[in-house]
Amino acid sequence: MKYWKKYTREKLTKRIDEALESTIDFQSSKYLGYPVSKLDENVFNTNGKILSESPLLKSYIANPNNIGCHTLGKSEEAFKGSQELEKEVIQVLAVDIFKAEENEYDGYIATGGTEANMQALWIYRNLFKKKYHATLEEMVILSSEDTHYSVHKGSNILNVENVSIPVDFDSREINIEALDAIIKKLIKEGKKYFMVISNMATTMFGSVDNPDIYAEILTKHNVPFKIHVDGAFGGFIYPISNRQSTINFENPNVSSITIDAHKMLQAPYGTGVFLCRKGLIENVLTKEAQYVDGMDLTMVGSRSGANAIAVWMILFSYGYYGWFEKISTLLLRTEWFCAQLNDLNIAYYRNPFMNIVTIKSEFIPENIAYKFGLVPETHEGDNKWYKVIMMSHVEIDDLSKFVEELRTHTN
């Protein structure tokens, strides 16, 4: 790893203190033009002793605004400290995890995977409009039926049709013949420009799509397309556990990627990440935001600099090898759990590089599912699956109690 290092507690604190020192202190400064201030001292303790012992809490009190996309260069000078740490986060994720070339990427910390996925669709819609003078009716989004519901939100907001591709019930793999037939039909109906959401660990199954399947068929039909990888859940696991993965920026078919720090990285909510190749994010430049230094190319505008510092702090507390050890532990627990299910002849789906196990509902009584907090595929109608996720708090002791309940039920 070129940039992803493990820092001591002292170095982490020093870097964060330096970042905050180079960010305007609205407690003491008299800047008149910013609609910004520190947190309200009548409500929040802005001078407590605990702040000196917690650089992250100090960041939240300082309340920096990371508006803009800092990989492009110019940004709001008032918040340059927290922006610099965000740039380091994007650098680690783009270069070290997703194998982008130096300075050939852009990105920012979004509010979550939903925003990051919608950012990608927004970029590609505008790109097709600018480059090909495409109409909304000529564009279409392709995504598997297991894709996160954010694609439907994006489709609705951007007014671009989304078409779901069927997957095999047991393997959760995209039905290639159906994909080919659907693309043929869409072209015949007048669709000319295709946006793809390809999954790196679906929310329900942890299943991973092969983006090259989409690329091969779309290339065969000679239509322009862009592929976005939704790695909201899998982005901090799959590239670590599967070192042979080609779902990264070395793959020319991949144009952008979503990752969520507030899932596996256990960062505060509001810490999704959007990454893309250079030359794409400019398609959503908001020219009217002229009072923002460096302009704005993000969907939400103002963003928490403290959240960016939180993600930076977690990444550099672990370093690559510390994170590898953590993921390896979770995968060992997952393998142990799967072995118990095999002994009980319980049918389930699991991608071998992921920590999600999704069990067919016929093997799980509703009272057991409720007792252990299993998540169903649907709360409405005929549910066919329940999922178990080996997060950090889910230990083998917890899993063994669940297994014993299942054993009693099956006997």
Task: For each feature predicted by the language model, list its residue ranges.
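N-terminal entrance/gating region of PLP-dependent enzymes' catalytic architecture
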Residues: 1-104, 385-386
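Buried hydrophobic packing segments
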Residues: 86-93, 116-125, 151, 311-315
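PLP-dependent enzyme catalytic core of the Aspartate aminotransferase-like
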Residues: 91, 380-411
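Short Gly/Ser/Thr- and Asp/Glu-enriched loop/turn motifs at secondary-structure junctions
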Residues: 103-104, 349-356, 380-385
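Conserved PLP-enzyme active-site core in the AAT-like
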Residues: 108-285
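Active-site C-terminal subdomain of aminotransferase-like
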Residues: 240-243, 247-351
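Conserved PLP-binding catalytic core of the aspartate aminotransferase-like
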Residues: 345-371
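Short amphipathic alpha-helices in soluble, non-transmembrane regions
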Residues: 365-372, 401-407
